[in-house]
């Protein structure tokens, strides 16, 4: 039962094919880690590693012991599947290759 000291928060987790958003009423002073545990998402998605998961509140990275405020949305982030630097490097190389051979050969 909700009391006047309860706050409303959301916990979100997304896979490419499925997204979950759980709305909760939690006591004031609840941490992001506590809200994730209360959401049931760790049971629903056994692939989430509670010890190493990266989390944020509205796209801003936070620590698991961050105390939540009214209407916060805790987001559980999946691990990256590609190194961002390697992806940028590959795109830059592909762009250079396209620019080198850009003519049709008819101009001197």
From Swiss-Prot:
Gene3D superfamilies: RnfH-like. InterPro entries: Mopterin_synth/thiamin_S_b, RnfH, RnfH_sf. Belongs to the UPF0125 (RnfH) family. This is Protein RnfH.
């Amino acid at each position: 039962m909700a009391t006047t000291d309860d706050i409303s928060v959301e916990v979100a987790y997304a896979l490419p094919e499925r997204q979950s958003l759980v709305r909760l009423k939690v006591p004031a002073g609840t941490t992001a880690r506590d809200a994730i545990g209360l959401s049931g998402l760790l049971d629903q998605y056994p692939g989430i590693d509670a010890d190493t998961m990266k989390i944020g509140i509205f796209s801003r990275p936070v620590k698991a012991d961050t105390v939540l405020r009214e209407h916060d949305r805790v987001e559980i982030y999946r691990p990256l599947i590609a190194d961002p630097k390697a992806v940028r490097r590959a795109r830059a190389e592909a762009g250079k290759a396209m620019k080198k051979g850009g003519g049709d050969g008819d101009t001197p």
